[in-house]
């Protein structure tokens, strides 16, 4: 888990030093996702260290969603950040207030009940498909991990082996105590998602040193004995 701590330290470094970013909506939006990624990674790491990896996978699912969303947004850094900030998220007027403060513009008037509008008509898979041109392989990765993580989030029966163990004699053991099961694979995926998110954050104009994150990603996969790329039979 030392490698994951190294990733978290690298992710926090620009936050500790004070964010440096371009004066654009894309960079502003990316900085929000960077903070969220750092917080979620810290929470996933804490849960895995204390034996709650299946629960950490619910947070990992949120990290995957953010990775896909930001990757899609980065395909059109001029328009999509504004759509994200001004449409669906008008339910949160603080977003536009933060943007105004960041860019030195006049503070917008708050609306008591801002109108809800979708910022994109694309499905989640549709966003991932569009993001392929900036993050090759993101759609296949999403198809590989997202159903598993959704099982954890929604408690589907296919995830029941994480909560109950049935023995040949009919004995049922409730698995309610912490254990180290699935910690390594959870952290491996969390680091991969973090690297991709950080790379997109940098592409949108936020200063992030990707070197330590990339190195830690390789080390954690080596330590787990896992390939960094999807096996060919899963990538087809």
Where are these regions (language model features)?
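A cross-kingdom marker of C-terminal helix-rich interaction/assembly modules
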Residues: 1-236
């Amino acid at each position: 888990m030392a490698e994951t701590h190294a990733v978290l330290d690298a992710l926090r470094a620009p936050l500790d030093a004070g964010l440096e970013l371009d004066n654009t909506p894309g960079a502003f939006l990316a900085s929000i996702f960077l903070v969220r990624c750092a917080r979620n990674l810290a929470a996933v790491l804490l849960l895995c260290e204390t034996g709650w990896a299946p629960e950490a996978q619910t947070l990992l699912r949120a990290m995957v969603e953010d990775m896909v969303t930001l990757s899609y947004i980065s395909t059109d850094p001029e328009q999509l950040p504004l759509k994200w900030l001004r449409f669906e998220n008008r339910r949160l007027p603080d977003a536009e207030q933060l943007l105004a403060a960041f860019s030195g513009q006049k503070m917008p008037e708050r609306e008591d009940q801002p109108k809800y509008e979708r910022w994109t008509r694309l499905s989640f898979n549709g966003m991932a498909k569009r993001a392929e041109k900036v993050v090759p392989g993101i759609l296949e990765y999403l198809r590989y991990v997202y159903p598993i993580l959704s099982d954890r989030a929604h408690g589907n029966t296919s995830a029941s082996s994480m909560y109950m163990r049935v023995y040949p004699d009919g004995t049922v053991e409730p698995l309610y105590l912490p254990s180290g099961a699935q910690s390594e694979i959870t952290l491996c995926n969390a680091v991969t998602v973090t690297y991709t998110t950080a790379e997109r954050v940098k592409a949108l104009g936020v200063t992030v040193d990707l070197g330590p994150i990339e190195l830690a990603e390789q080390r954690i996969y080596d330590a787990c004995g896992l390939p960094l790329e999807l096996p060919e039979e899963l990538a087809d």
